[in-house]
């Protein structure tokens, strides 16, 4: 297994750690609940950066594989959708927005599975990558939940939802 594929798998492995730090407020080894959110943010940022890094490495060193073309967008969907569902639990995003995003992601994943069953691997498009970046930035802003950034957060979140449609 090559490095880009390992980074993609690493991104998926980080998801449960991200969720625990985001949603479990009273960890005895942390001074306060805010620490958990900041650690969750750091994990999410690292996972998001692996998304950018795995693709760059794969293209630069000609390490593109069918596994990577299929799993990389799926890992992104798992990361973003898990984060959005957790953020509903924290009351930071309306459930309807998450439903719109997840419905679209499931639909696209379904198309990918049908294509894969027929021996065709569909790589992520430019617009899909662009949408994912906006979703990831929106998630980061929703995690930190800084009141001064509320308007910016809402703007980026709306752009992410519109790009999703």
What do these predicted ranges mean?
Residues 1-165:
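Alpha-helical transmembrane bundles and membrane-interface segments of multipass inner-membrane proteins
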